[in-house]
Amino acid sequence: SEQLFKKYVELVCLEMSYYCNRACNYCPVHDLERSDKDLEIPENIFVSVLNSLNKIDYKERISLNLFNEPLASKNFHKNVSRIKQKVPKAILSLSSSGDYIKSLDDLKKLDNCGVDEILFTMHTPKDKTWNREYCEKQIKRFAKKIQFSLGENNIKNLSFSFLAGKLHVTVYCTDWNKLGNSRGGLIKKLRPEKNRINPCEKPIREFVISYDGTVQLCCHSYHNKTYSDHVISKIDPKNSNSIFKIYASKALTLARK
């Protein structure tokens, strides 16, 4: 199972905290809360995951968020430094709303602690529909905060990217009400009209760990304190092979067929 994990897993999603400050209408958090600011991944599970990844010399991507706002956590920078120390070859990336970025210095801090890539989405306010005028204002405001000079194409495409030190930064204003995912069918308006026939590659190439150490079928599977319909298993911090055994388990094996 260790060798299978090393061979096939290209992305480990590691959600280190619970809280999200937003409740976008194209996300399950809109109806299923993520309000606990203090809830974070248990220390023994965090250490166990890092030790396991270190053991196989993991060098693929680690995504540092699921349904939380990662930058809301006061321990975020410290934990990223610990990941970088223990799994130095991994590419550390995350998505964020940008709400906790106040200046270019905040991006420099992320670069210094070991984040490699960050994707900022300028979200619409709760229960509002996407509109271009609002998004243009948002992207201009954010660019000003981080001292980025926008070109005509940036405004036209509602996106820009640049390097802050070694940190690759991308900012965009996607209309997720049109282009979003139903998150395992929870967002009814985004459910596809036809059911897919072909198997999905996500259970093969991704391994998804929620804030409490439970493992989900896929990064689109929602989980919070009251909703846990897609939990596959829970990491055993006393077993250094736990993530590998879960990856090779019957539940995930069946999901790949």
Please identify what each model-predicted range represents.
Residues 144-190, 220-257:
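C-terminal accessory region of radical SAM enzymes
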Residues 209-210:
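Short, acidic, Ser/Thr-enriched surface-loop or helix-capping motifs
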